[in-house]
Amino acid sequence: MDPNRYQGIGMTSRRTRERLVSRLAEEGIRDPRVLQAILEVPRHLFVDEALASRAYDNTPLPIGHGQTISQPWVVARMTELLIEQSIPERVLELGTGSGYQAAVLAYLGVEVYTIERIKALADQARQRMRDLRLHRVHVRYGDGSEGWAQHAPYQGIIVTAAPEEVPDPLWDQLDEGGRLVAPLGGAGRPQELVLIERVDGELRRRHVASVSFVPLLGGCR
């Protein structure tokens, strides 16, 4: 992806993006690699054109089908947690949505395998990756709760919708030393963003923040 091709003007300009990055830094995002990715990946291309002027607000936005693109702080913090120790070679993402989170990871050099259960969103995300020449992102239409065993093990797993608990198949696909970042709690319950690490065969869990995500649902549509 050539960031210079997608600078935008007005409310999508580089100056607007820089203001967002400054705000994220003020709110605790420290990793300069993550801040650079947020600066360079054109979030306005991952939302409806009518919402482009709000793309660099630190807020979630609707993307249709009852789904949202996460607020930039959440994307930045989840990314920061995944790459804290090293850039993972392969990451599995459950819940492609618009594709923005996957694009941020790909900008950082990660090979991303992402699954979306809503066909229209999967098709749109796949086309965006082609348009942006993000060849490291592989989009699959399907039920993410089963993971994507074909490309396992993953050094990172990121869940962008909230399950009650982490789906069991994902544990078999997380590499030793790998990290899983997910919002847990499901619909109608308080949710917490957690980091789970596999260390010497054991799973170590850490609470990161209180969050609000759409629920992780099974099946496809």
Curated annotation (Swiss-Prot):
It holds the Pfam family PCMT. The keyword Membrane does not apply. The lineage of its organism: Bacteria, Pseudomonadati, Pseudomonadota, Gammaproteobacteria, Chromatiales. This is Protein-L-isoaspartate O-methyltransferase. It catalyses: [protein]-L-isoaspartate + S-adenosyl-L-methionine = [protein]-L-isoaspartate alpha-methyl ester + S-adenosyl-L-homocysteine. It is an enzyme of class 2 (transferase). Keywords: Cytoplasm, Methyltransferase, S-adenosyl-L-methionine, Transferase. One of its GO terms (molecular function) is protein-L-isoaspartate (D-aspartate) O-methyltransferase activity. Catalyzes the methyl esterification of L-isoaspartyl residues in peptides and proteins that result from spontaneous decomposition of normal L-aspartyl and L-asparaginyl residues. It plays a role in the repair and/or degradation of damaged proteins. It comes from the Bacteria. InterPro entries: PCMT (IPR000682), SAM-dependent_MTases_sf (IPR029063). Belongs to the methyltransferase superfamily. L-isoaspartyl/D-aspartyl protein methyltransferase family. The gene is pcm. Its main location: cytoplasm. GO terms for cellular component: cytoplasm. The keyword Ribosomal protein does not apply. Its EC number is 2.1.1.77. It is found in: Cytoplasm. The active site is at residue 70. GO terms for biological process: methylation; protein modification process; protein repair.
